Amino acid sequence: MSVSIKPLEDRIVVRPLEAEQTTASGLVIPDTAKEKPQEGQVVAVGPGRVAENGNRVPVDVAEGDVVLYSKYGGTEVKVGGEEYLVLSARDVLAVVTK
């Protein structure tokens, strides 16, 4: 899925994935008690940063990847009624493979 945001340099746009809404015992977790999601799907990737020697360093993630990111990293933006997070590639901790 492509969004109308084109990130610059080593930034990526992530759609946060909602965490489980109920506990294992079936209790529903209210919105006020939920943690910020730290997992999301990459929907756009910048071209990479330019190194001191002038070469472009590509970003390690691609569109469609599911990533884990820093809890308080990035900037929240709303586009077309959907919420996204613009992160630096350095805020991505891991790529999730299932």
Curated annotation (Swiss-Prot):
This is Co-chaperonin GroES. GO terms for biological process: chaperone cofactor-dependent protein refolding. It comes from the Bacteria. The keyword Lipid metabolism does not apply. It is found in: Cytoplasm. It comes from Micrococcus luteus (strain ATCC 4698 / DSM 20030 / JCM 1464 / CCM 169 / CCUG 5858 / IAM 1056 / NBRC 3333 / NCIMB 9278 / NCTC 2665 / VKM Ac-2230). Together with the chaperonin GroEL, plays an essential role in assisting protein folding. The GroEL-GroES system forms a nano-cage that allows encapsulation of the non-native substrate proteins and provides a physical environment optimized to promote and accelerate protein folding. GroES binds to the apical surface of the GroEL ring, thereby capping the opening of the GroEL channel. PANTHER family: 10 KDA HEAT SHOCK PROTEIN, CO-CHAPERONIN GROES. Heptamer of 7 subunits arranged in a ring. Interacts with the chaperonin GroEL. GO terms for molecular function: ATP binding; metal ion binding; protein folding chaperone; protein-folding chaperone binding; unfolded protein binding. InterPro entries: Chaperonin_GroES, Chaperonin_GroES_sf, Chaprnonin_Cpn10_CS, GroES-like_sf. Keywords: Chaperone, Cytoplasm. One of its GO terms (cellular component) is cytoplasm. It holds the Pfam family Cpn10. Belongs to the GroES chaperonin family. CDD domains: cpn10.
